[in-house]
Amino acid sequence: MPVGVEARASWRVVALTLLLLPAVPAASQPLPPRPLQPSMPHVCAEQKLTLVGHRQPCVQAFSRVVPVWRSGCGQQAWCVGQERRTVYYMSYRQVYATEARTVFRCCPGWSQKPGQEGCLSDVDECANANGGCEGPCCNTVGGFYCRCPPGYQLQGDGKTCQDVDECRSHNGGCQHRCVNTPGSYLCECKPGFRLHTDGRTCLAISSCTLGNGGCQHQCVQLTVTQHRCQCRPQYQLQEDGRRCVRRSPCADGNGGCMHTCQELRGLAHCGCHPGYQLAADRKACEDVDECALGLAQCAHGCLNTQGSFKCVCHAGYELGADGRQCYRIEMEIVNSCEAGNGGCSHGCSHTSTGPLCTCPRGYELDEDQKTCIDIDDCANSPCCQQVCANTPGGYECSCFAGYRLNTDGCGCEDVDECASGHSGCEHHCSNLAGSFQCFCEAGYRLDEDRRGCTPLEESVVDLDGQLPFVRPLPHIAVLGDELPQLFQDDYGAEEEAVAELRGEHTLTEKFVCLDHSFGHDCSLTCDDCRNGGTCFPGLDGCDCPEGWTGIICNETCPPDTFGKNCSSPCICQNGGTCDPVSGACRCPPGVSGAHCEDGCPKGFYGKHCRKKCHCANRGRCHRLYGACLCDPGLYGRFCHLACPPWAFGPGCSEDCLCEQSHTRSCNSKDGSCSCKAGFQGERCEAECEPGSFGPGCRNRCTCRPGVACDPVSGECRTQCPPGYQGEDCGQECPVGTFGVNCSGSCSCVGAPCHRVTGECLCPPGKTGEDCGADCPEGRWGLGCQEICPACEHGASCDPETGTCLCLPGFVGSRCQDACPAGWFGTGCQMRCACANDGHCHPATGRCSCAPGWTGLSCQRACDSGHWGPDCIHPCNCSAGHGNCDAVSGLCLCEAGYEGPQCEQWCRQGYFGPGCEQKCRCEHGATCDHVSGACTCPAGWRGSFCEHACPAGFFGLDCGSACNCSAGAPCDAVTGSCICPAGRWGPHCAQTCPPLTFGLNCSQICTCFNGASCDPVLGQCHCAPGWMGPTCLQACPAGLYGKNCQHSCLCRNGGSCDPILGQCTCPEGWTGLACENECLPGHHGAGCRLNCSCLNGGTCDRLTGHCRCPAGWTGDKCQSPCVSGMFGVHCEEHCACRKGATCHHVTGACLCPPGWRGSHCEQACPRGWFGEACAQRCHCPPGASCHHVSGECHCPPGFTGPGCEQACQPGTFGKDCEHPCQCPGETWACHPASGACVCAAGYHGTDCQQRCPSGRYGPGCEQICKCLNGGTCDPATGACYCPAGFLGADCSLACPQGRFGPSCAHVCTCGQGAACDPVSGTCICPPGKTGGHCERGCPQDRFGKGCEHKCACRNGGLCHATNGSCSCPLGWMGPHCEHACPAGRYGAACLLECSCQNNGSCEPTSGACLCGPGFYGQACEDTCPAGFHGSGCQRVCECQQGAPCDPVSGRCLCPAGFRGQFCERGCKPGFFGDGCLQQCNSPTGVPCDPISGLCLCPPGRAGTTCDLDCRRGRFGPGCALRCDCGGGADCDPISGQCHCVDSYTGPTCREVPTQLSSIRPAPQHSSSKAMKH
């Protein structure tokens, strides 16, 4: 080893020793920890790399030319020549390499303290930055771990905590909505529900408590989840069932009116039918006594009736046809109208004074009282609303275009052309008053016909090719109802019925009208027929058209008839009325159908049964008005009004029976009468008895005997002549009294008596001396001389009027008809008050309630526990866990119960109302049959007991903590510790004994080679250098240390020690990590062997083999190249001819004697021979000199100046003078001897055989060297290549693009395609096809030969080469099978959408589809004010200028307003946004609904109105300044000035005249007073 190398090696050893030696501790310091060794506990080995620099030798060389002596220099034996010499020398370079060394450190989680044998102290990793844990950090012996608080779970990094979304599992156990929160969750309920005590179940709450149930006025709770809206008095509910509008005062109980009600300026004004007049209360109607007022004009007697009167005649007389005159029966009547119609132009009536001319309706008598002239009815304010046309004898109403005549014949109503479908509008129709208007959708315009619509972009084409013209606007057509076919009955029968109904009486002598007149007084002619009526053929009456009746067709059909002569009966039901012409039914609100057969269902009313009513206790509402049916004595929208005067009972539908003139008031509940002074009796019908007076006749008179007292005041009367009374005796005795002082009482049983004698004057219907007896059965009238009609249904004849007195429940002239539905009582005048489908008795009106209802008016729903009609059946839900259906009686069980009588809990696994909800409890938990709440068994928790107890807890509700060591879990039910593998003992406090492991330490360890056993899993902890389950395997190559976990640092194929990791280097390498190559001259393992190469050969550092320089060979490079070879590895062949050898190094030819040239191919020049042609010939002139030997003649077979040329074929011998004698071309002669031998390419005894394939040359001894199927010339060995190849030995394939013999043809294949070098056939690449690969694959094919089918979907394009899919816009995936995910669009979904405000983008173009409330290219704009919804198309309906939410349209009310549309102000006492803030004002003081400031009343001020106005201020809030002069103060409330110092006037600035000269007093005292 050279000295330098040895020195460097020694230095490295010293350096390594210094590194390994521990520092010597000072005597004053404590001993440091002992150096760590691999055998110490918790010590881990590590590899540490260091960078080491050293000098590396390298061999260099240079060349130079030096003079050398050479021998054989021609004439001289030696001469000096030039020779190139190479000099080799050694140099050094500085190189750096990394060296690895093993160091020992404490394993992670351990540390070494002074004096410890190894690493025995645990490191508390949690003390430093909490160990990196996000949650709690738990230190363990030799390590640590992170935990998370409840509601969080540990992430994969073992440190980060992530919130657990409990709502993802079973909705968190929540019945309605689960809301996740950090570390926990909570349950929420839908509107109308509240959270149960279990925190999960939702219970229904009163729906009225949420926003007043949406009601504008009042919310009435019906059930827990149902309510109805109710309006304040004078308001009615709209169709939406929430808002209220002011209702007509006539809508409630007919406005309190007995007969008719008319609304004027918001107030109800009552009216009465003919024959009645308003009572003093301006509501009730009382009969007009036409007899008493002299309006009857009866000839004999007058009998007053309800609403009318009737004339009666004395005995022996009979009532005339006019109903007033009386005629003796035996008197012959002379008809004054018989001659010339009495001179009348129209009607003539015979009277006792002569003919009386009358005119038909629409005419009036002229001044001659004979002639009838037409009345211009249109000039006298007719009922026509729009157009009036006067006609002879009448007038006709009509309407403008677009209107049609109402059924009353007067009013006009607009024709809704749009609703009838006759508008002809193509798109939209808008009805106008009297007309309509068509309009088109966006993007269209109205055609010239004003009906059709044409797109804006379309041009108008003149279809008929004529000039354009302007079309007039269409006239608006009035649509009339089509008249059905009319029915015609026998007119005679109808006339008889009419006559019977009129009750006319004819004389015994029947007379016949003459001169084509008719009527009861023969005063009518055919000219009197009205309303289109025509005369009968006999000219004896009018034939009326449809809808008219009467003797001259001047009366519309009665309500229950229609058609011609009113002969067809109406078939309208439920109170519907029929058109008198067509018979079409007009249904009242709440009823529908062609015949009004469809009434409104319960809870609805109105014309189309669309209005919703909400009556208390499920009460039924009036089908017309929606009003609730009230208890007796009450009426009105909310039954809050007392009955009007003289009405009582349910719905105030019964009339009081009191004598109103004698009565103070009538009880509204039971109809009892309170009498005025002077009257008594149940109906106050009787005056006080003589000797009593006053209210109820309870006071006794104090007059002397024989003197009567006033029954009202009790005053005593004076003595008057019989039949008279009064202070001046000018008054006749009142009815019922007679005699002196009218003291006698008539004993005429209510009939009047003669005022003087007391003789009874019996009224009609009475007879006898005291008029106490009624007329005999079948007789009536004065003197009981009239015969009663045939009354039906047990009715009797009124002895006074002769009318049939119908029993309650019947009506009609003969009581032949039962009361119509909804009416009862005497005369069917009382309206039934039965609600909710109840039926009333036609006589008594008593309600028979439908199932589920009870009460006098069936307005009260069945009480709990009863059901059926009138609620008479008791419920049989005896278990007490339910009620029964009020209609069917079926038990409606409470939540959690079922069975016919609700006696059973829900079957196992079900709960709730109807036991229809399925329990979701798990792990054997019991389910509450009412709420579904789970009661978990021990060891389980959660809403559905789906979670086991968390680690460390057990028992019921997991409320007990486990007492187990080492983090061992415990049994969730019993709490007993379940020791993990490796632990044992009652509390798992002990680790397994040595050589045992697993659960209960029951398994035996199987570890070898000094390994220890893991007490938990039994895994072997191998000693360094070993691995495997049982530590039987040594570390594999490249690994070392404990568990073979360290990677060796050995390089260049070096192997390391499996325990310590030290490197063992392979041949050719050295160093700590085998990173250094062997130095020159050294080789083998560790470079310890020396090389012995000669002749400049170099040594291989791995094998030691010599790498020889050019020209040398052998193990040690000791031998030159063999003859004919030269160069590196002696692999090059010499190119020398004539048997010359070449230089073994350079390859230069060493020519034999006689030859020269670079390849020794030339003979010596003439005159020269021998080696290097250096010798001159000495032959005679002209003689040849042999170029080798110098002889002066050529040897046989050669010729030429230098004998260098062989004999020509066919010659031989010396100087080639002899001709060959060999037969044929297959023979050749030897050039020297002439012997015949086979020619090149032939062989055999007769030289006739060609050389076999693969051989050539003389005797076929040479082997052909042609490749790739090439053939060789049998004579010369030249190769003939097949198609596709070329070259001397056919070793080269045709270059690309060529083919065929000698590669002469050019390929014609397409780009990228190859062609067969032999045939030129095109070999197509994948994706191409065709003879020249000129075509691509079809669209659905790909690959080589287009053999494979594409799998692209959704219009994707397939790559023809490899089948990969190119997806269209909006699709992605290997096969374009996935649409772009949300937020992406375009090609391969690579573009990111730019839509804002949660707008979604169209996956193809990226166009934004905006959600409700936004618009714009990127949905960046919020809907403009007043619009909301999708596309901002919906208009906000907010009032008070309030904006609306652009998304939902919800009105954002300003301060001071509330309601769905901000239509309501704050309730008194509330203010601010949403009217949620309560005013801080005293009771009765309102506050500003916006600011909440108190609105102080006049005279008060301050924030709470607790201060009086300061002087000089008055009014509300003391905001006004007083305007008082003369030092006067003003009233703080009204501002009125209180004058002082004689000042007067409204502002105290006027001085009286008498004081004007008096000088006013100085004002300083007043100033002092003011100042004081």
UniProtKB/Swiss-Prot annotation:
Recorded hits in Pfam families, A to Z, give: cEGF (PF12662), EGF_2 (PF07974), EGF_CA (PF07645), EGF_laminin (PF00053), FXa_inhibition (PF14670), hEGF (PF12661)
Major place of residence: secreted
Under SMART domains, the record lists:
EGF, EGF_CA, EGF_Lam
Instruction: State any single GO MF term.
Output: scavenger receptor activity
Residue positions with a glycan: 1000
Q: Report disulfide bridges, numbered on this chain.
A: 44-107, 73-79, 106-119, 126-137, 133-146, 148-161, 167-178, 174-187, 189-202, 291-302, 298-311, 313-326, 418-429, 425-438, 440-453, 522-535, 529-542, 544-553, 566-578, 572-585, 587-596, 609-621, 615-628, 630-639, 788-797, 791-804, 806-815, 832-840, 834-847, 849-858, 871-884, 875-891, 893-902, 915-927, 921-934, 936-945, 1001-1013, 1007-1020, 1022-1031, 1044-1056, 1050-1063, 1065-1074, 1087-1099, 1093-1106, 1108-1117, 1134-1142, 1136-1149, 1151-1160, 1173-1185, 1177-1192, 1194-1203, 1260-1272, 1266-1279, 1281-1290, 1303-1315, 1309-1322, 1324-1333, 1346-1358, 1352-1365, 1367-1376, 1393-1401, 1395-1408, 1410-1419, 1432-1444, 1438-1451, 1453-1462
Enumerate the subcellular locations listed in this protein's record, separating them with semicolons. Answer: Secreted
> What keywords tag this UniProt record?
Calcium, Disulfide bond, EGF-like domain, Glycoprotein, Repeat, Secreted, Signal
Membrane-spanning parts: none
Native organism is Mus musculus (Mouse)
Name of this protein = Multiple epidermal growth factor-like domains protein 6
Q: Where is the signal peptide?
A: 1-26
Any Gene Ontology CC annotation: extracellular region
Which InterPro entries does this one have?
A: cEGF, EGF-like_Ca-bd_dom, EGF-like_CS, EGF-like_dom, EGF-type_Asp/Asn_hydroxyl_site, EGF_Ca-bd_CS, EGF_extracell, EMI_domain
Q: Which residues form the EMI domain?
A: 40-121
Which domain of life, per UniProt? Eukaryota
Residues covered by the EGF-like domain? 122-162, 163-203, 287-327, 414-454, 518-554, 562-597, 605-640, 785-816, 829-859, 867-903, 911-946, 997-1032, 1040-1075, 1083-1118, 1131-1161, 1169-1204, 1256-1291, 1299-1334, 1342-1377, 1390-1420, 1428-1463
